[in-house]
Amino acid sequence: MLIDDTPTTFTSPRDSIDTGIATVHQTLAIVDELSVWRNFFLGQELTGRFGALRDTEMKQICAEQLREMGIDIPDVDVDAGNLSGGQRQVVAIARAVYFGARVLILDEPTAALGVKQSGVVLRFVAAARDRGIAVVLVTHNPHHAYLVGDHFTILKLGRQELDEPRENVTLDELTHQMAGGGELEALSHELGR
């Protein structure tokens, strides 16, 4: 793998994180019983003398970062369990961006979300992309991919089936390839349809 044109090998997940690669997994590392700001800083809390938490500063930073990315969570003191699925995803993504992600790998960020919540997440993905962060969006939804993507790669059983920039692929072609491509055509022929 090349990082800034330099061949790089990672020996642990920490190595990739230190390089600026962040992953937001489908099953979020969000603690429902903690506030939004506590989740935002979880494991990387700002502390003062004698280890005291700098609560006020962390709340302010969290609120500012969410606002800068176009996300409206009026009260960062609210427990994360009270947020919608889309808002929870956005908090996890904003956290990765704030802590220096240059490459953001998102694993099915809209999988269990409705249309409105998916829109919240996709707007945030577009904002991260527009800030110069490389985004790898893993999804089974061609419509979501096409809304925010500028390059598409489709893998089937670990093999690359498609690798094209957006200008070379229509939404219909992307949908067809993601749905099985040639296999669907063979099945259609076999079934006489």
Task: Locate the predicted segments by residue.
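Glycine-rich phosphate-binding loops of nucleotide-dependent enzymes
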Residues: 1-193
